[in-house]
């Protein structure tokens, strides 16, 4: 029996890569990532994970602070990354949806800032 176990241990292929990460958080290189049920990083979206929503950029990095989505903006906790709901952050009211509707003036200002960034 011992000989069988030793033989199997020698001839069993061992993968250098760890098993795929599924439905879990991974901290790597100072960033936080979430791998979905298929083992792929969640990228470029707001995703509900458990009871909370989180924002991920195009590389799959969890985003914190104020994030802008078209005409809406949302705040994600600097500590946990969770989308804040039914709160006031920096004097701005956030409703139960988690989003703050932006005024036309804010949208125009944002467009000007985006153009300025392209020039610089």
Feature locations, PLM:
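Extracellular adhesion/carbohydrate-binding repeat motifs centered on closely spaced tryptophans
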Residues: 1-119
């Amino acid at each position: 029996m011992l000989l069988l176990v030793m033989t199997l241990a020698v001839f069993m292929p061992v993968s250098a890569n760890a098993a795929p990460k599924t439905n879990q958080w991974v901290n790597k290189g100072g960033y936080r990532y979430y791998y979905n049920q298929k083992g792929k990083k969640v990228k470029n979206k707001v995703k509900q994970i458990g009871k909370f929503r989180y924002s991920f950029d195009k590389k799959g990095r969890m985003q914190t602070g104020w994030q802008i989505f078209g005409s809406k903006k949302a705040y994600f906790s600097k500590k946990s990354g969770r989308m804040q709901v039914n709160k006031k952050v920096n004097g701005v009211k956030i409703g139960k949806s988690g989003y703050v509707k932006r005024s036309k003036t804010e949208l125009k200002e944002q467009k000007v800032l985006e153009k300025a960034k392209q020039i610089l």
